[in-house]
Amino acid sequence: MNLPTVLCIIALILGVRSAKNGFFTKLGKPIVCDDINFVGNYCQTKCVKAGANNGFCCQQKCYCLGLNDYAPTLQVADSSEKACQAMSG
């Protein structure tokens, strides 16, 4: 067998997991964070519960980091997405 074939087989066995960032949605609506829960770990808790690695409040919505590819996310303008990605470090 050649090397690419072996690498593909190993990847399938290990189960390659991809991650994405975005505003997680539940029933088509984003998780809202307002002035009361902007500070603290409200969004982190909500995002981790949704399967993400982390999360924070950005533009009054919870922005999740490390969601799986199949997690539903809100479609937003590129400028909004870039602003939240910049805040994530």
Curated annotation (Swiss-Prot):
Which PROSITE patterns would you find in this protein's record?
Answer: LCN_CSAB (PS51863)
- A cellular component term, taken from the record's GO annotations: extracellular region
The record, for InterPro entries, names: LCN-type_CS_alpha_beta_dom, Scorpion_toxin-like_sf
Q: Which domain of life is it from?
A: Eukaryota
Q: List the disulfide bonds.
A: C33-C57, C43-C62, C47-C64, C58-C84
Q: Does the keyword Cell inner membrane apply?
A: no
As given in the record, the signal peptide range reads 1-18
Q: What subcellular compartments does it reside in? A: Secreted
The UniProt keyword set, sorted, is: Disulfide bond, Ion channel impairing toxin, Neurotoxin, Secreted, Signal, Toxin, Voltage-gated sodium channel impairing toxin
The LCN-type CS-alpha/beta domain is annotated at 20-85
Q: Name one GO molecular function term.
A: sodium channel regulator activity
Q: In which tissues is it expressed?
A: Expressed by the venom gland.
Family note: Belongs to the long (4 C-C) scorpion toxin superfamily. Sodium channel inhibitor family. Beta subfamily.
- Domain statement: Has the structural arrangement of an alpha-helix connected to antiparallel beta-sheets by disulfide bonds (CS-alpha/beta).
Described by its record, this protein's role is as follows: Binds voltage-independently at site-4 of sodium channels (Nav) and shift the voltage of activation toward more negative potentials thereby affecting sodium channel activation and promoting spontaneous and repetitive firing.
Name of the protein: Neurotoxin LmNaTx28
